[in-house]
Amino acid sequence: MNATAMHRIVELCLRLDNHASRLYLSLARNAGTQDLQGFWQDIAAKNEQHQLYWDQLLNWADKGMLNNLFDDPRKTLDELSGLEERVYDLADNCAQVRSKKKAFTMAFKLEFYLLHPTFETLSQYVATFNGDAGSDFSYERFVNRLFDALQQNELGTLELELVGEVIHRLWKENRRMAFLSNYDELTGIFNRRGLFNAITHLAHLAQRNENTVGVLMIDIDHFKAVNDNFGHQFGDDMLRRVAGSIREGIRASDVLGRYGGEEFLVFLPRVEPLSLGEVGEKIRRAIETMPDTRASVTVSIGIAHGHVGREVDADVKALIYQADEKLLAAKAAGRNRIEL
């Protein structure tokens, strides 16, 4: 059900993008000047270049790699369906627009509709795995182009400029909220939700490539005592520094997240089992020898590895459970150690 719902969500976003292209082409046909016609045509052409982006997301959706991206896919579907009706009507109405000012008003209205958080959530998800591949979706650059075109056509009225500024501010807030839904604000690494979204994606790739994957469960020893003796501000700083040390000890292709409290999880999407002990020991030593700290900081680490079969989610959960059991064994054996 989730894979089907996610396919429909991405498909709706693609259709909305296509309606936007149709609207901008209508504005181009009725622009009145060559410069303005070229401006609207260029925006429509850039929208049409997003096809590869949507094709990739549709492929991921069909493989179940987006299943945990939204809390309530049905609600998202309903909202996007209602949005499509409004955007479709707006694009139809643009066919008769001759006024330059009304053309920009219609463009801002369209972009207001397309501020639905789904677009930013998908954009940040793609950027996580494709680097800056979502840069064509740079909303900031796009809004700045609209502002420039307003000024060049002497249409920079207070009302239109205010609408543009509101849209820009709403986009920035959408971006911030999408980030916070997947990242831990304190440490800057994935939170539990973002962590599992990333792991699900990489686990599917590992299954396809038949790679061995690894899981490290890392827990700060006696963290409650640190908070009690030195205060929560010191404890927060320790969490940030431990997260930084772990990040420095793993590859860029590995995934690090805050699993909960003082516990961290590292997912290695491709690993040689014999090297896992070295990775764990490297992290343990780096944290034990962190400079400039008033309290002794050590961690216990549980490590598991295996292959991902057809039941991707179940296999990942089984590996995490195994790593957690190893972590408990490390604690029972005296802490500040790794267990394979």
Positions of PLM-derived features:
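Alpha-helical bundle segments that constitute or directly flank the non-heme di-iron/ferroxidase center
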Residues: 1-31, 102-122
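Alpha-helical transition-metal enzyme core signature, strongest for iron centers
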Residues: 13-21, 40-54, 108-115, 139-150
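Carboxylate-rich helix-loop segments that flank metal/cofactor sites and access channels
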Residues: 59-101
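Nucleotide second-messenger and two-component phosphorelay signaling modules
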Residues: 176, 201-214, 218, 229, ...
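Conserved nucleotide-binding and Mg2+-coordinating catalytic segments in signaling enzymes
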Residues: 179-197, 206, 218-232, 240
